[in-house]
Amino acid sequence: MYIFQADQLSAKDTYKLLSGTVIPRPIAFVTTLSSGGAVNAAPFSFYNVVSSDPPLLSISVNRTEGRQKDTARNAVENGEFVVHVSDEAIIEDINETAASLRPDESELTRTSLHPVESKAVSVPGIKEARVRFECKLERHITFDNDQGITTADLLIGRVVCFHLDEKVYDAEKGYILTDELKPASRLAGNHYAKLGEEFTLIRPS
């Protein structure tokens, strides 16, 4: 077995180990509004549910040479953002939004996706996404590396409104139909995955 002390690894090697082993990761497709009114959109796979009561989602946004990305800056300034489930039908468009553009440019111009008005926040959602969560910023936490450089912004959002396409939601039972949702997930590097074979385990009492 290989053993590595974390303080002896480069940032790149640490990223490769974590992103290659903590898999598959759900992909949050996040929209925010810039100060000039541009709809910024970007995908993040350092993402998960924090709590269902209250309904909280976490998104970690890595910085580039200490500089905040548009998503983190906009979310902190406005206190709002919208998280979308990345599915197979739109994952290629979502990948296009990972391009580095100016803050006043909308990544949506690189895609066939369309903004749609939200119900509880000022930030638009994405019409083509089959699940979206309108969020208010609950907490913003920054993290520094061993050199004292701020390298990540953790956004914790409280979901204030859920949007579910009729095809992915069983309204009678209150269940999400994963076979219809077809979520896409992130692996290491440029690799992604579809939902694989499901199996059932009974939780012990």
Swiss-Prot record:
Keywords: Flavoprotein, FMN. Its cofactor is FMN. The keyword Flavoprotein applies. SMART domains: Flavin_Reduct (SM00903). The keyword Ion transport does not apply. One of its GO terms (molecular function) is oxidoreductase activity, acting on the CH-NH group of donors, NAD or NADP as acceptor. Belongs to the flavoredoxin family. This is Uncharacterized protein YwrF. It comes from Bacillus subtilis (strain 168).
